[in-house]
Amino acid sequence: MSDSKEPRLQQLGLLEEEQLRGVGFRQTRGYKSLAGCLGHGPLVLQLLSFTLLAGLLVQVSKVPSSLSQGQSKQDAIYQNLTQLKAAVSELSEKSKLQEIYQELTRLKAAVGELPEKSKLQEIYQELTRLKAAVGELPEKSKQQEIYQELTQLKAAVDGLPDRSKQQEIYQELTQLKAAVDGLPDRSKQQEIYQELIQLKAAVERLCRPCPWEWTFFQGNCYFMSNSQRNWHNSITACQEVGAQLVVIKSAEEQNFLQLQSSRSNRFTWMGLSDLNHEGTWQWVDGSPLLPSFKQYWNKGEPNNIGEEDCAEFSGNGWNDDKCNLAKFWICKKSAASCSGDEERLLSPAPTTPNPPPE
């Protein structure tokens, strides 16, 4: 009975093929090719992945590149940083490394397109958190990729704006360098260390108006001491760094300095005294105290009780006090000018910050 079925099945197969031809269906080469591909699952996945990546690149290329339309870039960068933060927060010792590496790659590309003043505060905060997370990475992961990323990041830092958060960036780099010293003696450790040294030097060479630990205001740099000296020694401390015990030239400068002093709740020397002639107040640069500045004395001051010949910031105004008393002090000097990239590149990098000796 099985022998009689085979001719019948062959006849049915021929009939079905004829019917398919009747409605215009043919087994084309493309159809056969697709059938062949479906037998190779990994290859199909690769083709689909390539198609998706190509579409993503097309979409990225449509992001506006002009500075006036830079907001979309900034938002994308900020989203990438947020995703990176989330990935880092979920780290176990040997997981999520591939995701972090991919996020770092995208972040590097985004930093290269940053306008000069966009999202710097957010980037700084994310870098701070990332530094802490890097210290928890397993000993052997992605060192070669990290080395390459640091090399390219150094070039990106060279394009950062000259000011904005330089002090914080410098401190973060210093701490990161110390963390690298504790890495296991694995591949590329020496190269990573050298890259960090060069990156730190590049940040130090960025043109900045004031040295580290000084405050910039209206073309001048101010150093607020953290130790105390008498009035004469305060003058010496400022002179040793090419500055002067502060001489106030305008109402705006007075308001700025008074605010700094009152916030810290400190008694602070200024460069004003009547040592040469009682009752005739004179600045350390030889200029007299203008009548319009007398309004800044506290009520009842100066009163010269017990030979009080030197002026200080006290509360919300000025007070006269004995010059031999130890108090905080403020130094002032002109800010550096930055004429362009040539001056920035030629200026030597300081080996250490240079506040007055305390």
UniProtKB/Swiss-Prot annotation:
Region called 5 X approximate tandem repeats, residue ranges: 96-280
Cytoplasmic side: which ranges? 1-37
Attached carbohydrates are found at 80
Extract the InterPro entries matched here.
C-type_lectin-like (IPR001304), C-type_lectin-like/link_sf (IPR016186), C-type_lectin/snaclec_domain (IPR050111), C-type_lectin_CS (IPR018378), CD209-like_CTLD (IPR033989), CTDL_fold (IPR016187)
Identify the residues that the record assigns to the C-type lectin domain, covering every copy. Answer: 217-332
In terms of SMART domains, this protein maps to: CLECT
Motif Endocytosis signal per UniProt: ranges? 14-15, 16-18, 31-34
GO MF term list: D-mannose binding; metal ion binding
Q: How does it sit in the membrane?
A: Single-pass type II membrane protein
Q: From what superkingdom does this record's organism come?
A: Eukaryota
- For this chain, the annotated S-S bridges are 210-221, 238-331, 310-323
Q: sequence repeats: which residues?
A: 96-118, 119-141, 142-164, 165-187, 188-211
Supply the alphabetized keyword list.
Adaptive immunity, Calcium, Cell adhesion, Disulfide bond, Endocytosis, Glycoprotein, Immunity, Innate immunity, Lectin, Mannose-binding, Membrane, Metal-binding, Receptor, Repeat, Signal-anchor, Transmembrane, Transmembrane helix
Q: Name one GO cellular component term.
A: membrane
Where are its TM segments located?
38-58
| Gene Ontology BP, a term | cell adhesion
Q: Which residues bind Ca(2+)?
A: 301, 303, 305, 308, 319-320
Record localization? Membrane
What is the annotated role of this protein in its UniProt record? Pathogen-recognition receptor expressed on the surface of immature dendritic cells (DCs) and involved in initiation of primary immune response. Thought to mediate the endocytosis of pathogens which are subsequently degraded in lysosomal compartments. The receptor returns to the cell membrane surface and the pathogen-derived antigens are presented to resting T-cells via MHC class II proteins to initiate the adaptive immune response. Probably recognizes in a calcium-dependent manner high mannose N-linked oligosaccharides in a variety of pathogen antigens. On DCs it is a high affinity receptor for ICAM2 and ICAM3 by binding to mannose-like carbohydrates. May act as a DC rolling receptor that mediates transendothelial migration of DC presursors from blood to tissues by binding endothelial ICAM2. Seems to regulate DC-induced T-cell proliferation by binding to ICAM3 on T-cells in the immunological synapse formed between DC and T-cells.
Q: What is known of its domains?
A: The tandem repeat domain, also called neck domain, mediates oligomerization.
The record's note on quaternary structure and interaction partners says: Homotetramer. Interacts with C1QBP; the interaction is indicative for a C1q:C1QBP:CD209 signaling complex. Interacts with ICAM2 and ICAM3 by binding to mannose-like carbohydrates. Interacts (via C-type lectin domain) with CEACAM1 (via Lewis X moieties); this interaction is regulated by the glycosylation pattern of CEACAM1 on cell types and regulates contact between dendritic cells and neutrophils.
UniProt name for this protein = CD209 antigen
Species lineage, top-down? Eukaryota, Metazoa, Chordata, Craniata, Vertebrata
